[in-house]
Amino acid sequence: MTVKLQHRLARLAAMTLLGATIVSVSGCSSLWPFSSDNANKPMALAADPGRVQIRSLWSTRLGDVRFPLTPGVSASSMALAATDGTVVLLDTTSGRDLWRAKLPDTLTAGAGTDGQTVAVVTQGNDVVAIQSGNVIWRSKLASRAYTAPLVAGGRVFVLTADRTVTALDGKNGARLWTQNRQQGEPLVIQQAGVIFAVGDTLVTGHSGRFSGINPANGSPRWEAPIAFARGSNDIERVVDLMAPFSRQGDVVCARAYFSTVGCVDARQGQVLWTSQSRGAVGLGGDARAVYGADQDGRVHAWNRRDGARLWSNEGFMYRGLNAPAAEATRIVVGDASGYVHWLSKDNGALLGRAQIDNSPVLFQFATGAGSVIAVSRNGTVTALSAQ
């Protein structure tokens, strides 16, 4: 199999056809970073240098997660959801449930929150809003969603797979407006996209660009492209922006699928820089740098100001890395074998690791209080501290 064909099939495996079933590529196990195929055999882990001591602060169970889970974080609480309809609001300090609900639905996106209302999306294309463990309303969407709803300003904003943005009333789920930004692309990515607020502007990602929208009526304000659709077929032309993204003030950095990473001034709608990088997971970052893992498992750091490459770590090739998260002095990245790795921000060197279970780590969130909360595909939720 040629390298070009491997890249094309890897892109295809992460997409869905609009209005159709999930596209799967069988018989070619070398597509995935954690494949058992010899061509892409996961690199053996280096010896743990033990430069940080890692301990578990608390652990709890969520349920299997088979969709692109995005945590909803507000103050000291975190909203999480599982495929089986479990929705929970956790206290990030103790790990205890503030409340837990069980919906009679399979979930495909979640969990957005403003600290009071948690919003998720079901396989039946319903947005479900929950407060204190009780469903307060449901609202039907016209398309499947893989991106967690944004709950802000008394509204719930939803980005669906067909690149439509819908605004719902936070009190009753009534539809306020809908904006469709699809530009004829027949393929979409079965991963979480980009939606957030900067000041009085709603910002979403579609077709390689950030779009600023008036949240009151859905009218466009600006666009800032960090990638352009190129290629000889529909697969190669998919360049949607992917979660997670990195925000510092008005500057937001994101990855365009298998194309570039880049940063924009989200208040002005101005592109600051872009850099080529073939990857299928989002980014982390801090005031100094942006951190990401490419498709082959290299971890990179880019200067946040101008995009200059600061360092790369090739010690995790084909291990199925997720998007790095930034602590005060370290970055943290998870892999497909359930390991969470701590790296130096200065040069990317490995500092230590811990295994939370034997399933892929979906994400790890740096709380800002000296701990990292990691969630695995099998539903393990663990807070870890590195000293």
Protein language model features and the residues they cover:
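Bacterial N-terminal signal peptides that target proteins for export
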Residues: 2-16
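Bacterial Sec signal peptide processing site at the extreme N-terminus
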Residues: 23-47
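Extracytoplasmic beta-rich repeat domains
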Residues: 36-42, 50-72, 99-115, 136-152, ...
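Structural signature of WD-repeat beta-propellers
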Residues: 82-83, 122-123, 160-161, 205-207, ...
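Loop/turn-rich, solvent-exposed surfaces of beta-rich toroidal or solenoidal domains
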Residues: 293-300, 308-342
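Short loop/turn segments that connect beta-strands within beta-propeller blades
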Residues: 91-94, 131-134, 169-172, 215-217, ...
